[in-house]
């Protein structure tokens, strides 16, 4: 099981995916709850790897996870450039607009909720794609 983690100052995206790319969990949590939530997810899903975005607050979160998690799990940093734009498109694939909202061009639509969890999904997918190229 792989945990995707999109760390942020105010909120964080989390996702859990199996190695066959089945999505088991995704959620946006406030940053203060992220560590406890990750701890719980590691127990609930037997997480083998944490995949995390490499921008903004990544280094401090990597240190915090390495220090404070009660389980030893490898942390892999993945390039997260353009992931927010990609996540916006993915949101509309996962939750197609209804009614008159369908008439608005996709590039002009804004998701009605934070999409950090979808970024976490994309980080896992990027990691798996890189891994499959390397084997």
Regions found by a protein language model. Name each.
Residues 1-5, 9-135:
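Phosphate- and other anionic-substrate recognition elements at nucleic-acid/protein interfaces
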